[in-house]
């Protein structure tokens, strides 16, 4: 008996080291080894001393007003709060799954008192029997001989790690969204002020044309042309008044609270609002993009689930064991000779399951293939977002300079047309065309500047930036990794 028990224990220890989880191999990145090159992309310096993902958002965003708004959003945004709670929930799920590897030991106390009728009693007379017991032990503890429970534990661990990356992704998205909403608000405020100024100019021209018309110098056509310019500017003014209000509402939603009243003075759109970040190499994205890391953890979780599905084909052994004391009298539980013990192993060997085990294994493998495709798609999406950002960086500088030159030329055109109209050399149609050309060019300059800024924000996010508040240097990273530093 002792030899059989010892053999069983040795076999359990040996088999407990078995794992049926397939060896994990990271899929090859389905993108080029370098970002696109060409006229649109400018010069890419390659590997960066400090990766963009390690540059703190307080260093990237130079506007103190925007910095404070991002801080408010990180404290109050509900989506970010849900992401953090999801991490806690999956951490608890992992702890639950890990606990199944160990026996659950508890104390059981029981007591029964039963009356048997005479026809069931061995003596032929009614009898009352009593039994009391206290035991310490475990019930139905599964010996993880083929790694099923360890596979489920590893799967839960990878899912927990995936939610951590999802939280990180939610934060980087929130930081970029707050910045975009803030920049959009500033741009629409600039458009609103430009429209007010333009409306004032149109109104002065209309008043001048009205006086000229009253004395018979200007025609009715000139007067109506001036009026159309005024009414068009009024409509545009109402549009930007609405957009500014909606931009503020969108910002409040992202902040999770009202816009603070004591914000510091912000920077203007024409000032240096952002720090240029290095692009690095595509291989950096595999370790820096939280959505890619999340997809990889989900892939590793699916890989672990294959091990659990394989282990289901093998026997499962459960153990119930306890030791304690039993007695007919409650007062005799701890008397000499009242000791008791139970050792009850059980084995379950699947023989016929109507194909369910094979189907479960096929399902686990298909899920892994799905996760491989999702992981590769995440890499491709990241590569495209970075490439688009680099193309925007390489062309917006030239576009903005050309647009500024257009505004300058349009302003000179307007000044000349206004002078010629006032001296009677040219008609009002030329002046109206000059006014509209200048207004359109100024509007487009604001729009182009907003697009340039948002493209830089999106590039920062695409490179994994927005998680750290302060820049993390390589020395700081090394200290974190070295416990003796």
Swiss-Prot record:
It is found in: Cell outer membrane. Induction: By growth under severe iron limitation. Its main location: membrane. InterPro entries: OMF, OMP_efflux, RND_efflux_OM_lipoprot_NodT. A lipid is attached at residue 18 (N-palmitoyl cysteine). One of its GO terms (cellular component) is membrane. Disruption phenotype: Disruption of MexA, MexB and OprM significantly reduces active efflux of N-(3-oxododecanoyl) homoserine lactone/3-oxo-C12-HSL/PAI-1, but not N-butyryl homoserine lactone/C4-HSL/PAI-2. GO terms for molecular function: efflux transmembrane transporter activity; transmembrane transporter activity. Residues 1-17 form the signal peptide. Changing residue 18 to G/F/W: No palmitoylation occurs. The protein functions normally in antibiotic efflux. The keyword Phosphoprotein does not apply. A lipid is attached at residue 18 (S-diacylglycerol cysteine). SUPFAM superfamilies: Outer membrane efflux proteins (OEP). GO terms for biological process: response to antibiotic; transmembrane transport; xenobiotic detoxification by transmembrane export across the cell outer membrane. Export of antibiotics and solvents is dramatically decreased in the presence of the protonophore carbonyl cyanide m-chlorophenylhydrazone (CCCP), therefore may be driven by a proton gradient. Antibiotic efflux is inhibited by pyridopyrimidine derivatives, such as ABI-PP, acting by binding to a hydrophobic pocket in MexB. The outer membrane component of the MexAB-OprM efflux system that confers multidrug resistance. Functions as the major efflux pump for n-hexane and p-xylene efflux. Has been shown in one study to be involved in the active efflux of the autoinducer N-(3-oxododecanoyl) homoserine lactone, thereby playing an indirect role in quorum-sensing; but has been shown in another study not to be involved in efflux of this autoinducer. Over-expression of the pump increases antibiotic and solvent efflux capacities. Component of the MexAB-OprM multidrug efflux complex, composed of six MexA subunits forming a hexameric tube, binding to a MexB trimer, which interact with the trimeric OprM outer membrane channel protein. The OprM homotrimer forms a 135 Angstroms-long pore. It consists of a beta-barrel, which is probably inserted in the outer membrane, and an alpha-barrel formed by alpha-helices which probably spans the periplasm. In the ground state the periplasmic end is closed, while the outer membrane end opening is 6-8 Angstroms in diameter. This is Outer membrane protein OprM. It comes from Pseudomonas aeruginosa (strain ATCC 15692 / DSM 22644 / CIP 104116 / JCM 14847 / LMG 12228 / 1C / PRS 101 / PAO1).
């Amino acid at each position: 008996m002792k030899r059989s028990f010892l053999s069983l224990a040795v076999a359990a220890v040996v088999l407990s080291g078995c794992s049926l989880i397939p060896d994990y191999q990271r899929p090859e990145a389905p993108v080029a080894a370098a970002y696109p090159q060409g006229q649109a992309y400018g010069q890419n310096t390659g590997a960066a001393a400090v990766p963009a993902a390690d540059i703190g958002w307080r260093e990237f965003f130079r506007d103190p007003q925007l910095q404070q708004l991002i801080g408010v959003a990180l404290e109050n945004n509900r989506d970010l709060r849900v992401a953090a709670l999801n991490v806690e929930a999956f951490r608890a799920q992992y702890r639950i799954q890990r606990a199944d590897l160990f026996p659950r030991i508890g104390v059981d106390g029981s007591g029964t008192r039963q009356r048997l009728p005479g026809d069931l009693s061995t003596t032929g007379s009614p009898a009352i029997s009593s039994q009391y017991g206290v035991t310490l032990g475990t019930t139905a503890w599964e010996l993880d001989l083929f790694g099923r429970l360890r596979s489920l534990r590893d799967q839960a661990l990878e899912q927990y790690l995936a939610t951590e990356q999802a939280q990180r992704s939610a934060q980087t998205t929130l930081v970029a969204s707050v910045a975009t909403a803030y920049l959009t608000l500033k741009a629409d405020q600039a458009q609103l002020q430009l429209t007010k100024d333009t409306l004032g100019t149109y109104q002065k021209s209309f008043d001048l044309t009205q006086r000229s018309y009253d004395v018979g110098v200007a025609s009715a056509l000139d007067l109506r042309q001036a009026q159309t310019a005024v009414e068009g500017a009024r409509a545009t003014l109402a549009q930007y008044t609405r957009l500014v209000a909606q931009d503020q509402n969108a910002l409040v939603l992202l902040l999770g609270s009202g816009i603070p009243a004591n914000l510091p003075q912000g920077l203007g759109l024409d000032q240096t609002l952002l720090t240029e970040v290095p692009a690095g190499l595509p291989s950096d994205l595999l370790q820096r993009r939280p959505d890619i890391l999340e997809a990889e953890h989900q892939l590793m979780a699916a890989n672990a689930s294959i091990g659990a599905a394989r282990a289901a084909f093998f026997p499962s052994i459960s153990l119930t064991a306890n030791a304690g004391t039993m007695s007919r009298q409650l007062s005799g539980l701890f008397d000499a000779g009242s000791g008791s013990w139970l050792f009850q192993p059980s084995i379950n060997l699947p023989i016929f399951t109507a194909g369910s085990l094979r189907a479960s294994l096929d399902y686990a493998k298909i899920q892994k293939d799905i996760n491989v495709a999702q992981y590769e798609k995440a890499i491709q999406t990241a590569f495209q977002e970075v490439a688009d950002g680099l193309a925007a960086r390489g062309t917006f500088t030239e576009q903005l300079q050309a647009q500024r030159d257009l505004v300058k030329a349009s302003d000179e055109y307007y000044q000349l047309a206004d002078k010629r109209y006032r001296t009677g050399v040219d008609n009002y149609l030329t002046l109206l065309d000059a006014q509209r050309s200048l207004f359109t060019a100024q509007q487009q300059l604001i729009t182009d500047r907003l697009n340039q800024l948002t493209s830089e924000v999106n590039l920062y996010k695409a490179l994994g930036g927005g998680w750290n508040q302060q820049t993390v240097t390589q020395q700081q990273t090394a200290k974190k990794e070295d416990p003796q530093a």
